Design a protein with these regions (language model features):
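Flexible, Lys/Arg-rich cytosolic regulatory linkers and terminal tails that connect or flank
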Residues: 1-41
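Phosphate-binding glycine-rich loops and their immediate beta-loop-alpha structural context
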Residues: 102
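Cytosolic Rossmann-like ligand/nucleotide-binding regulatory domains
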Residues: 35-97
C-alpha cells in the first residue's frame, strides 16, 4: 500500500532528526549523518561499522575534503557520512547509523 510506505518513511525520518534524507531513488535511499563527538563509531574503521546488509558508505566529508570510504578509513567526530541503502534496509540502516554516530 503506497500510503503505508509514505507513512512509514515519514515516521522513520521524524524519529531520526539528526539523519538527513538526501534522495529517494527507485529501490533505495541516500542519506547522511554528522558524527557526534563521543559517538560509539568514532575511531572505528568503515570496515568495523559496516554491519548492515544492503547499506554502503559512499562518501565522507571531513574538514572540507571529500573522502571515498574504503574499509581502512577511520571515522572521526564531525565527519559527514553519506550512505546508500536499499529500500528494504532503510529503517535498519538509519537506526544503525543513529546508534553508532549520534
Amino acid at each position: 500500500n503506497p500510503d503505508e510506505i509514505v507513512a512509514r518513511s515519514l515516521f522513520l525520518w521524524s524519529e531520526n532528526p539528526d539523519t538527513q534524507l538526501l534522495a529517494s531513488i527507485e529501490g533505495g535511499t541516500i542519506f547522511e549523518i554528522t558524527v557526534a563527538d563521543g559517538a560509539k563509531g568514532v575511531n572505528k574503521t568503515v570496515r568495523e561499522v559496516s554491519g548492515v546488509k544492503d547499506m554502503l558508505y559512499i562518501a565522507i566529508r571531513r574538514g572540507g575534503k571529500l573522502i571515498i570510504p574504503t574499509g581502512d578509513v577511520v571515522i572521526m567526530p564531525d565527519d559527514v557520512i553519506t550512505v546508500f541503502t536499499k529500500e528494504e534496509a532503510e529503517g535498519r540502516s538509519v537506526e544503525y547509523m543513529d546508534e553508532l554516530f549520534r
